[in-house]
Every structure is written in structure tokens, then in C-alpha cells.
Amino acid sequence: MSAAEPFFATRLPRLVMFDLDGTLVDSVPDLTAAVDSMLASFGRPPAGIEKVRQWIGNGARVLVRRALAGSIEHDGIGEEETEAALALFMEAYADSHALTEVYPGVVDTLKWLKRNGVEMALITNKPERFVAPLLDEMKLGRYFRWIIGGDTLPQQKPDPAALLFVMKMAGIEPEDALFVGDSRNDVLAAKAAGVRCAALTYGYNHGRPIAEEAPTLVIDNLRDLLPCADQAAEIVLPDDSLSPSDQRDQAVAVSKLWMKVIKALARWRWRA
């Protein structure tokens, strides 16, 4: 049963939590290189980028098991083989993130949210040891007050533990938070935490359209969350060279634009 629920009908969310791979960055090329390097060590043929794209989303261990199985189903893979392959994969992936790219619209969106006082957190199933170096290389780390990796807590998404932990640390209730992701795990974690979820169409969802997971909102670009949603338009951020009074005037103008978008989003409904 569906129930009508406004999508931040009167104000900005106080906290926005983001997934990483498939949401903020396209890391498939580097992950594929590491997977194929691991498979080569076992004398196996490369998996290739399209298969790896469908296997991502449940952490490094599951990715490695899927690569060994050559399928999204991996029940037949033993623990000893998994441990050996995981060590090779981790070593290969630690070498470089040269092929990873930030998706269009991400930096504009993070800048806008930060300038407007919205707290941000990163919650990913990627092992913690890889997260900080990647964020530094992509110049994204500065935007997040809280960063939770796949082994920071005992649980990973779709378990809501990381979302609940961040909200507790921030002192923010679920109705004042938003989760942005790209996969079934992200949507399930958000729903379990009682948080609205915006899901991106371009990410990694095992080859399935993200709309099938029934998030609160489906978007094609992270900039769709902003007042200036026209992809051809440049988002104008507050100018640091302006006087304090002019900056306040500019912030008020941007906030008025955002309120129009929020009222439009109030038409979206939760889907059971």
C-alpha cells in the first residue's frame, strides 16, 4: 500500500548521505583492472568491464567471489579460494585509481549543499582502506563530515546500521535526512532506516533499472536535486569575492529557487 508523503515540503534536508561507487564516481574501469589481474593470477580469462559492472555493490569480498564464479551467484566458491583471491584483488586495486572518474554534476551538487549548510556523509560498502585515498584523489573528501566504509561497522548496506549511526552522530531524525544511491542495497538501507531515497539511473544495480527498487525519487543526474536542474545551465554558487551583505542576498535568491523545487517534489510519493 502506498501512502502520500511530502518530499521535504517546507525546508532543505539537514543531512544528505551518499553512496560512492556508481553514485559519485565511476570506478568500474579500475575495479575491472584489479579483478582481471586477480583472475590472471589464477590462470583464468578476464571478466571484462560489462560483467564487473553488474557484480559491483556488495563489497570487495562478494565482488571477488562473483568474479571467481563468473556469475552474480557465487555459493559454490570456497573460503580458502576467496581469501587468496581477495588478497590479490586488494593488492591490485590499491595500486591506482587513474581510471576512476567523478560523474557530471557531482561537484556542483556537493558545493551547493555545503554552501547552504547541509551536513553530508559518505556511506559505502567499499573497504575503508580504499575510501580516503580515492576521495583525496578525486578531491571529494572535503565535503563529508562522516565517512563510513564497508568494514567501519560490522554491518554493510542493505543493513541500515551505517545510516542510523550517522544520523545518531549528527543528532538528526530520519525525516530530516536524505540518502542518495544507485543500487537495490542503497534503497533497502534507506527504507529500513526510515529515510527518503533519491536513486540515480546511471549507477550499478546488477543490470536492473533502479526504478524497479521503488526509491522515493529517481533522477538521471545529481544536479536534478538542485534548483537549477537544467543540465545545459551552469550552477551559480555564492561568490566569495562578494561583500557579506551581497552574499546573503544571493543565498536568499538561491533558497527561493530551492523552495520551488521542494514544493514540486512534494508530489512524489513513497512506494511500498
Swiss-Prot record:
Keyword line: Carbohydrate metabolism, Hydrolase, Magnesium, Metal-binding
Entry cofactors: Mg(2+)
A GO molecular-function descriptor: metal ion binding
Pfam families: HAD_2 (PF13419)
Superkingdom of source: Bacteria
CC per GO annotation: cytosol
Active site (record annotation): D19 (nucleophile)
Pathway: Organic acid metabolism; glycolate biosynthesis; glycolate from 2-phosphoglycolate: step 1/1
EC number: 3.1.3.18
Stored Gene3D superfamilies: HAD superfamily/HAD-like, Putative phosphatase, domain 2
Catalytic activity: 2-phosphoglycolate + H2O = glycolate + phosphate
InterPro entries: HAD-like_hydrolase_sf, HAD-like_sf, HAD-SF_hydro_IA, HAD_2, HAD_sf, PGP-like_dom2, PGPase_prok
Presence of the UniProt keyword Hydrolase in the record: yes
Record's function text: Specifically catalyzes the dephosphorylation of 2-phosphoglycolate. Is involved in the dissimilation of the intracellular 2-phosphoglycolate formed during the DNA repair of 3'-phosphoglycolate ends, a major class of DNA lesions induced by oxidative stress.
NCBIfam families reported for this sequence: HAD-SF-IA-v1, HAD-SF-IA-v3, PGP_bact, PRK13222.1-2, PRK13223.1
Protein name per UniProt: Phosphoglycolate phosphatase 1
Organism: Pseudomonas aeruginosa (strain ATCC 15692 / DSM 22644 / CIP 104116 / JCM 14847 / LMG 12228 / 1C / PRS 101 / PAO1)
